[in-house]
């Protein structure tokens, strides 16, 4: 596996996770 594609995959996972956490926190409040 290429290191660049691996870095992109990690970046997308972190971005999606943080985005869902923000939406979750706002709906929770």
From Swiss-Prot:
A GO molecular-function descriptor: electron transporter, transferring electrons within cytochrome b6/f complex of photosystem II activity
Its primary localisation, in coarse terms, equals plastid
Pfam families, A to Z? PetN
Which residue ranges run through the membrane?
Answer: 3-23
Q: Which UniProt keywords apply?
A: Chloroplast, Electron transport, Membrane, Photosynthesis, Plastid, Thylakoid, Transmembrane, Transmembrane helix, Transport
Q: Where in the cell is it found?
A: Plastid, Chloroplast thylakoid membrane
Please provide one cellular component term from the Gene Ontology annotations of this protein.
chloroplast thylakoid membrane
* UniProt record, GO biological process: cytochrome complex assembly; photosynthesis
Q: How does this protein sit in the membrane?
A: Single-pass membrane protein
Give the record's family classification: Belongs to the PetN family.
- Subunit note: The 4 large subunits of the cytochrome b6-f complex are cytochrome b6, subunit IV (17 kDa polypeptide, PetD), cytochrome f and the Rieske protein, while the 4 small subunits are PetG, PetL, PetM and PetN. The complex functions as a dimer.
Please describe what this protein does.
Component of the cytochrome b6-f complex, which mediates electron transfer between photosystem II (PSII) and photosystem I (PSI), cyclic electron flow around PSI, and state transitions.
Protein name in UniProt: Cytochrome b6-f complex subunit 8
